[in-house]
A protein has these predicted regions:
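Anion (oxyanion) recognition and catalysis
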Residues: 30, 70, 110-111
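Short internal beta-strands
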Residues: 26, 36-41, 76-80
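Short amphipathic alpha-helical segments and helix-helix/interface helices
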Residues: 26, 63-67, 106-107
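Short, active-site-adjacent cap segments at secondary-structure transitions
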Residues: 45-48, 85-86
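Short, glycine-rich nucleotide/cofactor-binding loops
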Residues: 4-20, 48-53
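A glycine-rich helix N-cap at a beta->alpha junction
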Residues: 54-82
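Histidine-anchored nucleotide/phosphate-binding helix
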Residues: 18-32, 38
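C-terminal structural segments of small proteins and small subunits
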Residues: 86-112, 117
Length: 119
């Protein structure tokens, strides 16, 4: 089993499919039996907030998919220092207080993983 780390940095629903494809890849890797970790930082932290709503013109609920991945064993951490200053919903709580991370955690994850991908 390989260890994969996906680092997401972009605002969800920003007109690109960065977050969408990252979450799809995480799910595909997990389904193959790989060990998957996701770290959200910068504006991507909004993916971990219940206040982030799927736009009407978007066919995929990114927050729901992230919750599903996490519930199915994908390790998840969200930048702690980004909480108050990043995203459209800066300062609003993450959907799970246990997912709050740090740069030290990210550094450990990078060092431990076989492959790191950024989106």
């Amino acid at each position: 089993m390989k260890k994969f780390l996906l680092i997401l940095t972009n605002q969800p629903y920003n007109g690109t499919d960065n977050a969408y494809n990252a979450l799809r890849l995480a799910g595909a890797l997990k389904n193959r039996g790989e060990y998957v970790r996701i770290f959200l930082m910068n504006d991507a932290v909004d993916l971990a907030r219940n206040s982030t709503q799927k736009p009407e013109n978007y066919d995929f609920d990114l927050v729901a998919k992230l919750k599903e991945l996490h519930a199915n064993g994908v390790a998840l951490k969200v930048c702690g220092s980004c909480d108050a200053r990043c995203g459209l919903h800066a300062g609003e709580p993450y959907f799970d207080s246990e997912i709050k991370g740090s740069m030290d955690i990210l550094a450990s994850w990078v060092a431990e993983c076989d492959q790191v991908m950024t989106f």
